[in-house]
Every structure is written in structure tokens, then in C-alpha cells.
Amino acid sequence: MPTASASESSSNQPESSNASGSIDHVLVEDRLFHPSAEFTSKAVISTEEQYEKLATAARENPDEFWRAEALEHLHWFEPFGTVCDWQPPHAKWFVNGKTNACYNSVDAHVAAGRGDRTAIIWEGEPVEDGQPRDQRTLTYAELQTEVAKCAEGLTQLGIGVGDVVSIYMPMTPELAVAMLACARIGAIHSVIFAGFSAESIAERNNDASAKLVITSDGLYRRGKVLPLKATVDEALEKSPTVEKCLVLRRTGDDAPMQEGRDVWWHDVVENQPGEMAAKPLDSETPLFILYTSGSTGKPKGILHTTAGYNLWAKRTFEWVFDHREGDVYWCTADCGWITGHSYVVYGPLSAGATCLMYEGAPNFPAEDRFWDIVERHKVSILYTAPTAVRAFIKWGDEHVDKHDLSSLRLLGSVGEGINPEAWMWYHKKIGGEKCPIVDTWWQTETGGIMMSPLPGITPTKPGSCTRPLPGVVPSIVDELGNSVDSEHGGKLCISQPWPGMLRGIYGDEERFVEQYWSDVPDKYLTGDNARCDTDGYYWIMGRIDDVINVSGHRLSTIEVESALVSHPDVCEAAVVGRPHDLKGQAIAAFVTSNDRGHDDEFRNELKQHVRKQIGALAQPDDIRFTAALPKTRSGKIMRRLLRDVAAGRELVGDTSTLEDLSSLAKLREED
């Protein structure tokens, strides 16, 4: 098997400083993995010509391309006129058409005679006698009835078009039902991850002027019951716009109910007739707000609208996951994040897929829970995050070896870049070296996947998201706005509007323009750095802030992290810059390891390992060992907080998405 080549010494590095502000590329990855002939023969997109035809049409004749796509893949109650009214930075797609994202996700399949197809397979966390205690399946016809009942209940509570509904629930079928019910009647859902604090819930309620909160009495997590309703009650003390609270009974624990405000799901929803039809809605009717953390200030409410988002979620799901009849698809994301919106609910359901939802932790009651689920439900497509893959590696191969994973035919990665070594473990241990891996790049703001291998045709390189999907026109520019060559990285921009693009930051037009559209004229600034190699493959090099300027050389932290993680005793690594009088910035690394001792010998070994993998320029100045890295609740490493730790500064910016303060507190104590 080919191996990654690497620069051996500082003589391989650029000799002069980088005046244009492009990023020096120092890590080389030349392993290439082709899909099997058997996989390609059955793939939805099975030839390079098919991809080129789609990509060329979308790039050169976008109106014609997207008109055909929208007419074929969405149901229209009333036809649209203009395909895209583009007045930078604002786009309107499928102007004056009327559709409904809930209809496209549910009713369309029932109307087509596929109502008996399984839509959702759900498994709760609790286990009794070695078996899951709670399991349910919903066909598309049953899902249609449940969603209609919920829509009727919401209407009874005074919710209508344009009203904002905050949803703070565990990963149960009712969460998907609530989202779809909002879409059915034109309400705007704002799903809040069930784990955020009361302060964070209130902040989101107030920013969106939410009228209703839907929650549950509690949820199960690692064998414990966590009270959700009590957290919501505290939030509602500071949420003056909220009029009602709809509560699902999940755990059966006590949940104080405030008369006149709080109502039970089983009283309001379950006894409804379930006959309410989906409401025809204008293409640009807001579908949902989803809050993401800002580096400073309050969280941003990313706004997506109905038709463009729905089409993008559906088509990207079909292209990337090669969906076929009979697949059991499992995206492990929570619906509190964009991945759950696009690839648990709207994308797969619009495509008529059978989706698995799991409520709990990946390591309860043991570290093999995911593989037990894959085996029992015969999951064929698995879409998970690099942070989960790294945890699986740390827990040990023996948990994987207990189970038959032969049902898997396709693997996916989402949330952040996956280090080549984690990619290789995923490929070998979970995929049995037969499953293509779709390493996807996209954002909350983009609505759906923007770059990914197409599994039937794209040779993959560990760590690369490969090529843009049809309709995505990327460009990479330096600090001066000039295009960069394949030897350098720069700011990743998108040059052409696409249907799934965000329509704004809710209630904050100035921030929307400043953050995404002010840097490069008429181009969407992703906030990520990237490079494009000579094969046209894209490599994400981290956030724009995740670049270190060492002696005039701009280095990607992702490449240094990948080198560290390639050491067999390193589980995870995060690299940041800290001020340095001579070099401008020094390289500071935070490392979690296996059982290896955290001594100077190991530090020096890791420094030499990076030097050998990349070169002297990228050798860390400082290496700090930690039991855990500070992460968001969606599993992303919060490098900006580590920058503050490395520099000895007070923490600044929004920390509401931080999962566990203890890891950060421990690092601060060591200063």
C-alpha cells in the first residue's frame, strides 16, 4: 500500500516569508483509494462523465440546471417563475413558487404509494437484560399521521405561519415529528441541543422571539435521567415572548407544570385526528433558525428557507450517500445541529430513505453500543464525526471485533476534518477496506454538503474532501484577494449562489454582511482555509483563525495536528499559536495520549516525530498533555479557547456551546 511522503528537514521548507498571506502547505498525503468495481457498477453516479455533465451544467447554465432539478425533485402546489434572483449578498430561489418541506419529506411518498416503507427506526438508550428497552418504527404513512396530529396540536396552541417554535428535546421520533409539523404549517423551528443551559435557551428564545417551547420531562444519557423540563422552566423565567410549553413524557419523572402555560404532548397531540394537510408556502418562507456560536458576542441565528434548502438537502443526500432502496441509513448526529436537520430529517426523508435514530451515548452500556446497533439493524450507511472515530480508536479494537459489520457498504465523516490516521482506521477497521469513505465538507450556513467524494467514482485521499458537488463553485484567495496555486492554501470562498445557502443571520443584517460578504466582493467567505492540489482535490486547513505565522511562514494547524495524531501513542491533538518575540508565533500543541507517561522524553519524541513527518518549521515549541480537549457539544475542538490558554489570556467570546468546562479549568490551573 502506498504511504504518505513527508518533508524530512527544514531544507524542504520555503525559504522566504510569505508576503501575499497565502498558507504554506507542508504535509504531503499521496495514498489513493479507488471504489471497488462492484460498488461502482451499482452506484447512482457510476461514471466520471455523469459527474462532469452535472457539474458543467450547474456551473455554466445554473438557471436551466436548477429549474430541471426543482421540477423533478420537489412537489409544487404553484409553479415558480425566476429560478434565482441574485442581488448580492441576497438570493431568492424559485421565486413565487409554492411548496412545503414537510410534504416533500413525508406526504409525497405516501401519495406515490410508498406509505408502507419504513421511514424511521428508533432506539432509546436504556437497556434491560442486555437488550434495548425502547424501540419503535414508523412507516411513511404512520409518520404522516403523527406529523399531522402534531400540526393540529400546534395550531390549537395558536401557532401559525411565521411563529418561532423552540424545540429542546432528546433524539426521539417526536423531535423529528415536531420539526416536520412546524414545516407543515409554516412555523419556524429553532432546535436547541438538549444539553444547553437555561441561559443559552433563554438567549435563543429572546433573539428569535419564540412563541412556544417544545420539550420533554427528561432524557437518558449514560444510564442517568437528565431533567430537561426543569432547565426549560428556568429559561422561561427570562423568555417573555414564550406563551406556551408543550411537554413530552419520555422518562416518567416528575416535571412541574405551570397552569395556563404548560401542556402535555399526550393531551394536546395524541388525540388529534391527524388529517391536517401540508400548507402551500412560498419558496422563501423561513423554514428554521439554527444558532451557531460566534467567536465573540452572542450566538448567530442562521436562517434557512423552504424550497432551496429542501432541494439542496435532498439532492446532496442522494449524490453523496448513493442512496438505494433497501438501505438502512444512520447519521449519528443530534438534531440540535445542522447535520441532524439536513441528514437525519429533511435530506434522507425527502429521498424516501429508511433512517435510524438513536437517543443516547455511544458508550452505554459499553463501548460497543454503536457496533451493536449496526449489527442488529443491519445498517448499510454510517455517517459520523471524526471526534467519534477518535474515541472508538481510544476505546480499542476489541469492541469492534465483537460484531458483524458486514452490512456496511458506505461510511461518511462530518463535522471537522478527519486526520489521515483516523481515516485509515475507519477505512480498515469499520469498513473492512471495502467501504468508500465520503469525507464531507460543509457548514451550518451552507445548508448541506458542499464538497465530498461521490462514492461510486471518486478515488479518495485520506484527509481530503476531494471535489465540489454540482452547483458549488469554490475559489481560494490570499489576503490580497488573489487566487493561489496548488502549493499554497488560502481563504475558501464560494463564487456562485447555490439553493441551500443561508438567507441571513436572524435579525442582524449588518452582521450577516460583515461576516460573510465583506471580505471578497460578491463571494461567500466560508471562514475556512483550504488548498486545492494538482488533481483538483480540496483540503480543508482549518478556520481562518487556525493559521500560525511562524517566522513569516503561514502554517495550517490541521497539518501539524495530523502529524501528531499519526504517532501511535497520540489519541487527539489540537495545535494553536501563541505570541513569540522572535518568530511572531510559536507552535503550542495540546495532546491526549494512551497510557504513555507524560514526561519530557515523550514530548521530545513527539517533536521529533513532527519534524520527521513535516519538517523543522512545523515542530511544536510547546507540548502540553491533557486528559481531554475542550470541545463544543457537537464534538468540535474549541481552538480559540486553547489560544487564550496558550497565551495566558483571560477567556473571551461565547462559551455557551462548550461541553465540559472541567478540561479547560484543569489547563488553566496548570498555568
From Swiss-Prot:
Residues that hold Mg(2+) according to the record: 565, 567, 570
Record field: catalytic activity: acetate + ATP + CoA = acetyl-CoA + AMP + diphosphate
Gene3D superfamilies membership: 3.30.300.30, N-terminal domain of ligase-like
EC numbers for this chain: 6.2.1.1
Entry cofactors: Mg(2+)
UniProt GO MF annotations: acetate-CoA ligase activity; AMP binding; ATP binding; metal ion binding
CDD domains with a match to the protein in the record: ACS
Sequence positions that bind CoA: 221-224, 339, 363, 551, 611
Membrane spanning residue stretches: none
UniProt keyword annotations, A-Z: Acetylation, ATP-binding, Ligase, Magnesium, Metal-binding, Nucleotide-binding
Annotated PROSITE patterns: AMP_BINDING
One cellular component term from this protein's GO annotations in UniProt: cytosol
Modified residues (N6-acetyllysine): 636
Region (Disordered): 1-21
Residues reported to bind ATP: 415-417, 439-444, 528, 543, 554
Post-translational modification: Acetylated. Deacetylation by the SIR2-homolog deacetylase activates the enzyme.
GO biological process, one term: acetyl-CoA biosynthetic process
SUPFAM superfamilies registered for this protein in UniProt: Acetyl-CoA synthetase-like (SSF56801)
Database matches in Pfam families: ACAS_N (PF16177), AMP-binding (PF00501), AMP-binding_C (PF13193)
Function: Catalyzes the conversion of acetate into acetyl-CoA (AcCoA), an essential intermediate at the junction of anabolic and catabolic pathways. AcsA undergoes a two-step reaction. In the first half reaction, AcsA combines acetate with ATP to form acetyl-adenylate (AcAMP) intermediate. In the second half reaction, it can then transfer the acetyl group from AcAMP to the sulfhydryl group of CoA, forming the product AcCoA.
NCBIfam families listed in its UniProt record: Ac_CoA_lig_AcsA (TIGR02188), PRK00174.1 (NF001208)
Annotated family: Belongs to the ATP-dependent AMP-binding enzyme family.
Protein name per the record: Acetyl-coenzyme A synthetase
Native source organism of the sequence: Rhodopirellula baltica (strain DSM 10527 / NCIMB 13988 / SH1)
Phylogenetic lineage: Bacteria, Pseudomonadati, Planctomycetota, Planctomycetia, Pirellulales
